[in-house]
């Protein structure tokens, strides 16, 4: 820095110190200028805040945002064109539903519904990706340019104006001690900077409809996202309602105990022509008989009670649910699903 530059910096610092510490008054700018300066300051703050909050709106998870930023930085360093996309919550939920829907199988009503919902969630994630790209290109990038160019340029003019004001005020108070030419130059430079700063702020604020247009584009993108999401969800809701109606019309199956599978050696113990010893009866195995799988306590007249493992002689099949048989000299009816046939009734 030149000697003249050092002197000017000293003058500015001296004047600033005088104003801050001693309470000396500097040159006051007009109210209209100060109002424009205030609006520019607020605009600077709101643009910075909107850029941050819009990113949070599109990508709410800070950990994912940090990871994504790191991965994309590494990709750029490596010269890779393809970047990693933000994992949308709809997509993550859709992946979960698809995974377990497929595990439940095609014969599961719940499983099939999970697959339908999962596929719809994946579609919504794609729509959200489109929103991210659209908003970045049409809203975030223009705002970033506004911050980096227009507002930065205005800030530069205001900073330069403040420096020249301090230099002007310092020299104005020392008229007679400082050459008149230096004072005159300080006045000219101050007025020049004021005019530049004032014009740049005026032009920016007069054209703020451009920012309104950017907001309108952002809202249009958000509306399109919600419209497409609504269509996907409405179609999904119709499918689920149809699935519920279809499931309601299917007759309910009744639970039937399934007999435990046993090997022939476990069932017979000996050849079918031998006699099996049971609790209280010796029954030749060449006549129709069955083995009790569970204890059966008769509740109605005519029913035949027995214990698990008892061998019952079969005399008749009443219908698809009941047998007639004998044990311990007593005869009666008993449910088919309580026994396992050893020697079937003749056809």
UniProtKB/Swiss-Prot annotation:
Keywords: Coiled coil, Cytoplasm, Endocytosis, Endosome, Lipid-binding, Membrane, Phosphoprotein, SH3 domain
Top-level division of the source organism's lineage: Eukaryota
Residue ranges of the region described as Membrane-binding amphipathic helix: 1-21
GO CC terms: acrosomal vesicle; cytoplasm; early endosome membrane; glutamatergic synapse; postsynaptic density, intracellular component; postsynaptic endosome; presynapse
GO biological process, one term: signal transduction
GO terms of molecular function: identical protein binding; lipid binding
BAR domain ranges (all copies): 18-249
SMART domains cross-referenced by the UniProt entry: BAR, SH3
Domain called SH3: residue spans: 285-344
Record PROSITE patterns: BAR, SH3
Tissue-specificity statement: Brain and testis.
Function, as annotated: Implicated in endocytosis. May recruit other proteins to membranes with high curvature.
Domain notes: An N-terminal amphipathic helix, the BAR domain and a second amphipathic helix inserted into helix 1 of the BAR domain (N-BAR domain) induce membrane curvature and bind curved membranes.
Family, per entry: Belongs to the endophilin family.
UniProt name for this protein: Endophilin-A3
Name of the gene encoding the protein in the UniProt record: SH3GL3
């Amino acid at each position: 820095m030149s000697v003249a530059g050092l002197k000017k910096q000293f003058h500015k610092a001296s004047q600033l110190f005088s104003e801050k510490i001693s309470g000396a008054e500097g040159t006051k700018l007009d109210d209209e200028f100060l109002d424009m300066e205030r609006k520019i300051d607020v605009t600077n703050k709101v643009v910075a805040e909107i850029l941050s909050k819009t990113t949070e709106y599109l990508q709410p998870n800070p950990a994912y945002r940090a990871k994504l930023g790191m991965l994309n930085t590494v990709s750029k360093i490596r010269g890779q064109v393809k970047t990693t996309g933000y994992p949308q919550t709809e997509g993550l939920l859709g992946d979960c539903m698809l995974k377990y829907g497929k595990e439940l199988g095609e014969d599961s009503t719940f499983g099939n519904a999970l697959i339908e919902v999962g596929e719809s969630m994946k579609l919504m994630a794609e729509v959200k990706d489109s929103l991210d790209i659209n908003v970045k290109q049409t809203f975030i990038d223009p705002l970033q340019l506004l911050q980096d160019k227009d507002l930065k340029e205005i800030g530069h003019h205001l900073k330069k104006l403040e420096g020249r004001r301090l230099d002007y005020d310092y020299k104005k108070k020392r008229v007679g001690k400082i050459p008149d030419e230096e004072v005159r130059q300080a006045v000219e430079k101050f007025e020049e900077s004021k005019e530049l700063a004032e014009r740049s702020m005026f032009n920016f604020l007069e054209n703020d409809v451009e920012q309104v247009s950017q907001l309108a584009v952002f809202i249009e993108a958000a509306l399109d996202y919600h419209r497409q999401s609504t269509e996907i969800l409405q179609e999904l809701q119709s499918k689920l309602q149809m699935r519920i109606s279809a499931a309601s019309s299917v007759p309910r199956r009744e639970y039937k105990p399934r007999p435990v599978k046993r090997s022939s050696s476990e069932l017979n113990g000996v050849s079918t022509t031998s006699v099996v010893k049971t609790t209280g009866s010796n029954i030749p195995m060449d006549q129709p008989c069955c083995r009790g799988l569970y204890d059966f306590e008769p509740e109605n007249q005519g029913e035949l009670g027995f214990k698990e493992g008892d061998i019952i002689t079969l005399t008749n099949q009443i219908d698809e649910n009941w047998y007639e048989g004998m044990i311990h000299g007593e005869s009666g009816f008993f449910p088919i699903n309580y026994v396992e046939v050893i020697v079937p009734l003749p056809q």
